[in-house]
Amino acid sequence: MRKGYKAKNRWSAGFLLLLLVAVWLTAMPRQVWAADRLPDVKQMEEGIVSWKSSSEGEKELLTGELRDQAGSAGSDWFAFDVARMGSATEEQRAAYLARLQDAVEAVYANKEDSMMRLRISDIHRMALTVIACGGDPENFGTDPDGNPINLIHDTVWNSNSCWGDPGDQGINGYIWALLTIDAKNYQEPEGAEWTREKLISELLSRQLADGGFGLIKTDPSDVDLTSMVLTALAPYRGQDKTYTYTGIISGQEETSTVDAVAEKAFARLSELQADDGSMLTYDERTSESTAWAMIALASWG
């Protein structure tokens, strides 16, 4: 198992399920849910929020150590979750944004150190948290020269920024870049180095022979990455548009639609499912993999 990829050392099973619930509920129209199931889901949300808060020794959301560690994966994803669920008050979200802005400004004030310890997807996470909490990632604090910090421009549109090309992190960079710009349907600026079409093409080009996706072409299909790719591609389902790219397996020019690639990817996910319905990653059942598969399914309706 790849230590650099699996996130078990950061996210507990309950925390991952919280992320699942938050994204799932906001991704799907409420009318498609059976009315008698909504109270169960809401109760689940509240239980997980209560567990996380109590485990941190806090009685209120986004306070204490959780807020003090704004800019870290654990705190940011929790803030993202409770903001998307509507559990955090406006005051709590504003307080978290203020602390997160301090963290972002510190990142830009120490770029050399930040580039060594952070990946571009970490900045995407911060941008998504800003959006969820009601902030503006295109104008979030100032850099040491007094210029507004534009997290969207610096991590997606402009590959000449200090964070470089989204692909420098491999497939993860493309996934989170696309998720970030679609979180609020950001418009591509004229002359953007990376466009939606380019990001989508890069993702499609990385489909493995069995239909799934992995970190590199020699890796087996990974449930988490396959599900993450499907989630990122979900806004483009049902379109006739074709994309042309060089497949990493064939080395040849290929043309496909998002739906055609997704059909193969979902088929591979089905093959990686255990008899009890959970998902297997490297022959191991994990809540993270199961949660990501459910998010992908929910995103595609």
Question: What do these predicted ranges mean?
Answer:
Residues M1-N9:
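N-terminal secretory signal peptides that target proteins for export/translocation
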Residues F15-A27:
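Bacterial N-terminal signal peptides
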Residues L25-L38:
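Sec-dependent signal peptide cleavage junction
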Residues A35-A70, T89:
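N-terminal module-boundary/linker segments of secreted carbohydrate-active enzymes
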Residues E60-E91, D113-N139, W163-R196, L208-K264, ...:
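An alpha-helical repeat/solenoid feature that recognizes helix-turn-helix modules
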Residues D145, I149-N150, R196-I200, A262:
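Core helices of alpha-solenoid repeat scaffolds
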Residues N150-P166:
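A conserved helix-loop-strand patch within extracytoplasmic ligand-binding domains
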